[in-house]
């Protein structure tokens, strides 16, 4: 027969407080680590978006003031495209992950006519044409610069893979500038 003074394990266990701090710590720490990693990841993504925008803007501003003779604009365009030049404008970005599309266009009515293009033979997309139509008036010259950066996630690439293209973000900015 059982001793009635001993309440048994079923009633002793809930009353015991030994080890509760360790259990709470084990439950809270993974959540805190995920929150910290999420904050770092969001900061990195924000920086990539900001630097991609800066790159496109700087290229459009600088290229819009080249002289309009037959060789100077093309020569100037060729100096912007090497990885070293990209790295100087946006040092936080990896130059090998940057894709540039640059056009100098002359407007004829609402139709942009490409004068120079990088990469050679490229044609403006519908979004680029729409942007330049809003910025550059008839018989004026302007530039279109689109910078795209392929950013790989640091912490959550495996989790984000089903939602993103190969667990990477590709911010893209198009800037149009009236040629001075």
Residue ranges and their predicted role:
Residues 2-88:
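Alpha-helical assembly-interface signal, strongest on the long, hydrophobic N-terminal helix that forms
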Residues 57, 64-180:
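Short, conserved structural patches
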């Amino acid at each position: 027969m059982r001793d009635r003074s001993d309440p048994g394990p079923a009633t002793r266990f809930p009353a015991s407080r030994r080890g509760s701090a360790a259990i709470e710590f084990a439950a809270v720490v993974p959540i805190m680590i995920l929150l910290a990693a999420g904050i770092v990841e969001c900061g990195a993504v924000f920086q990539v978006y900001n630097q991609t925008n800066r790159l496109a803007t700087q290229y459009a501003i600088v290229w819009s003031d080249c002289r309009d003779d037959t060789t100077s604009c093309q020569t100037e365009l060729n100096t912007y495209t090497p990885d070293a030049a990209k790295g100087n404008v946006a040092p936080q970005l990896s130059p090998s992950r940057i894709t540039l599309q640059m056009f100098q266009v002359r407007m004829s009515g609402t139709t942009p006519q490409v004068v120079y293009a990088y990469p050679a033979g490229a044609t403006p997309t519908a979004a680029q044409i729409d942007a330049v139509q809003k910025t550059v008036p008839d018989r004026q010259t302007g530039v279109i610069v689109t910078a795209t950066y392929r950013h790989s996630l640091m912490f959550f690439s495996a989790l984000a893979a089903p939602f993103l293209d190969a667990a990477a973000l590709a911010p893209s900015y198009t800037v149009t500038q009236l040629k001075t």
